Amino acid sequence: MTHRAVPCQPRAFSKIKVLVISFLFLMVAFLPFSSHGKLQEQIASYVSWKLETRAIHRFGGCNFAHQMQRNGIQRKIVCSDLERGNNTGMNACMQLVLSDLVARRVLLKTVHVHPWHLDGISGAFSVCCKDATEVS
């Protein structure tokens, strides 16, 4: 009797994604910042917006640009395809424009730590926090 290789199960990877996303939201919920919670709302909005744009990045193709205004934070994303063997990944750079310099510093510390993987094969979601006053 020959042993057959078991194909990869994508559900296990989906469970890992859910755990990572849950950890991120818990981390945002327990950030010890201002009592009125404005900064927590900004970061939570940023995280949820990033998750919403994953599908856009995955199916947007090369040189995709998207700009959105939410909660006083202006964001611009520019994506480009990267070829690595048979796998195609998306590399994105995001510019955050905040009215509050403290919020910029906090986002720089909490978000711009490691690249975020768009999928399990290749592609990194690199978040770049810029101290710009306006993104055209």
Swiss-Prot record:
Residues 1-35 form the signal peptide. It comes from the Eukaryota. Keywords: Signal. Partially overlaps TRM5. This is Putative uncharacterized protein YHR070C-A. It comes from Saccharomyces cerevisiae (strain ATCC 204508 / S288c) (Baker's yeast).
